[in-house]
Structure formats: C-alpha cells, structure tokens
Amino acid sequence: MNRRTLLRTTAVLGAAGLTTGASLDAATAATATGTSAPRRGDPLRVHVVLFDGVEELDLAAPYEVLSASDHFTDRDVEVQYVTLDGRRTITAAFGTTLRVDRGWAPEKADLLVVPGGGYARKEAPGVWAEIRRGALPRALAEARRPGLTIAALCTGVMLLSAAGVTRGRPCTTHHKARDLLQEQGGVLKNARVVDDGDLVTAGGVTSGLDLALWLVRRELGVDAALGLEAMLEYEARGTVWTSATRS
C-alpha cells in the first residue's frame, strides 16, 4: 500500500471512529482505499465499551488503531462501539456526542476494550458514576469466559477493579488511580502495558495507543504492528510486562 493510500485510509478511519461508531469491515476498507485482498480465518471481533463521561482519546485511539490493523493482515478485524444500554447517544468527557448503534454482547466478542474517563470529577458522568450505578462492573464480571480477552486503559481499569477482575492479577492504570487499584487487590506493575493473558491493562490517556499496538502485535503479528506504527508515525513506548504463561 503506498503512502497516498495510507493517508487516505487514515482519514477514513478517523471519520468512522469519531462520528459513526460503526464497524469498519473488509468491504468498507476496500472501498476506502481502492484495494481488496482475500481474507481467511475467523475475524477478530473487538468491542469498545462506551459510557457517558468516557474520555475522547481513550475511546478513539484503540478504535482507530485496531480498525486500521485490518489493512496489515489477511484476517478480518471487526471493531464496534457498544454500550450496556443498547442503541443510544453517549456524551464524552469534553462534550463530544456519539451515536452508538450496538448493544452489549460480549459473547460475540474476542476482545473487550474498556476506556476510562471522568475520574477527576467524582460527581460527574464517568467511571465513578458507573461504579456507583453498578451495572457495568457487574456486566464486566459476568462477561468473563474462556476465549475472551478483557483489556482496559487509563481509569477504565478501575471499572474492572470494581468488578473484581483485577484482584490478585498483575495490572496497571493511570498514575492517579494506582494506589486505589493496589488497595483493591491489584498487583501493580511499573509498565505502560501489562499483559496477563486474558487481562491486559494500560496506563493513562495516551497509553491507549500502546495498548492497541500491543494487542495487534499479540493477535495479528509483528508485521501488522510495524505497519501500523509506520502509518500512524508513532512508535510504541515502553516495555510490555507479560506473564510467564498466558491463558
């Protein structure tokens, strides 16, 4: 794929991620870039979980990176925004509104990605409000099953902590939430991304890029991750902490 095509693809992906919340499948990618290639195997199904007060960069970075990975592998990658409450419009931390057309269906996902947001404003929409409400942490706890990887970034990790998912597990989060994560039983690691098999966590805000690039490398291979880094003009930061064995 040449540079002009890559830049055009990036623009299309950015628009899709921030305005429609729709899955960018292989057919859409081919239309956007003027290219097509045979696909094989089962698709990698990614659900990015949204809620009112979610941070804009947290929701956009993993979506765009994982959607763009479709161009660097012969495996389809299907990325969708979902909400626990079904089809609705969410309002992000800085006022961006997104219409989300997909409801909660973790049984149809291989990877759940949980962003953060609103952690500094305890009475505003965001992570604290979702913890008080209780429904999303319960749903995340119940979603766990063999074959599903749950990933979270920034203070989205605290939703997993409230669900009991991080208890006794290596993990990380935004630096302002690290003490509480440890108090609630998380085993803190000093790394930007922590991979403990079916649980992958990342630090604050921009760490969403590194989380997504790591997941691409893990699920789709090094070449896909390198291709994305070149397209995005961004190199993954830091050493990923990984457990000795992955479930």
Residue ranges and their predicted role:
Residues 190-205, 233-234:
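Conserved Rossmann-fold dehydrogenase catalytic segment
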Residues 150-151, 172, 189, 200:
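Structural detector of well-ordered beta-strand residues that form the stable sheet scaffold
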Residues 2-150, 158-162, 178-182, 188-189, ...:
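Extended, subdomain-level signal for the structured scaffold at the beginning of enzyme domains
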Residues 165-178:
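Short, glycine-/small-residue-rich phosphate/pyrophosphate-handling segment
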Residues 129, 170, 202-205:
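Short capping loops/turns at secondary-structure boundaries
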